[in-house]
């Protein structure tokens, strides 16, 4: 299963075609289509299930995403972060399991050595937050993770199996400090 509270809520846009269970990311507002969203930071108070979101332009909001009145406040706060011409935020959705890009519970594992190699190649320090990974590993050679498919490793009591590579999208081209496109990480 995924990590607790990882991508537990998402904002569906007005053109979403949601079905019970897992839904593809194209149904939700996301950084690939709305770069300003990449500058949103989040913190969760597990006891109250309240989430605080902060953005350098939109400011800060604290909401309980499961409460209908709070959902309206959240949608109103998020709307200015969506570019003109894009489907507007319409509903807060709770997935029950992590709403990742795969239709099975998953955890994304990336390598700090690969990040350092890409940063060097691009001539800039790239933030780990561009990739929204669950786990960052150190000690491997750059790009070694590409050969990990089929491998298993232990993390505490959990055993993780690498089943596929992550296909990256344009969200990684956005500076998470500013929400502005900066650098072609996909080249």
Describe the residue ranges of each PLM region.
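Metal-cofactor-dependent catalytic cores
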Residues: 1-187
């Amino acid at each position: 299963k995924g990590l607790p509270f990882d991508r537990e809520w998402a904002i569906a846009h007005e053109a979403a075609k949601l079905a019970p269970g897992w839904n593809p990311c194209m149904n939700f507002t996301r950084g690939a289509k709305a770069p300003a969203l990449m500058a949103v930071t989040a913190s969760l108070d597990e006891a109250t299930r309240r989430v605080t979101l902060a953005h350098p332009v939109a400011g800060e909001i604290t909401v309980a995403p499961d409460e209908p009145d709070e959902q309206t406040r959240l949608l109103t706060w998020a709307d200015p972060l969506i570019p003109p011409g894009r489907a507007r935020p319409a509903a807060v959705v709770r997935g029950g399991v992590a709403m990742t890009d795969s239709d099975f519970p998953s955890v994304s594992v990336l390598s700090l050595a690969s990040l350092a190699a890409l940063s060097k190649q691009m001539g800039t320090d790239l933030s780990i937050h561009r990739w929204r990974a669950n786990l960052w590993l150190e000690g491997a050679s750059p790009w070694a993770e590409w050969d990990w498919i089929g491998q298993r490793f232990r993390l505490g009591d959990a055993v993780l199996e690498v089943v596929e590579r992550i296909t990256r999208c344009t969200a990684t081209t956005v500076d998470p400090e500013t929400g502005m496109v900066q650098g072609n990480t996909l080249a």
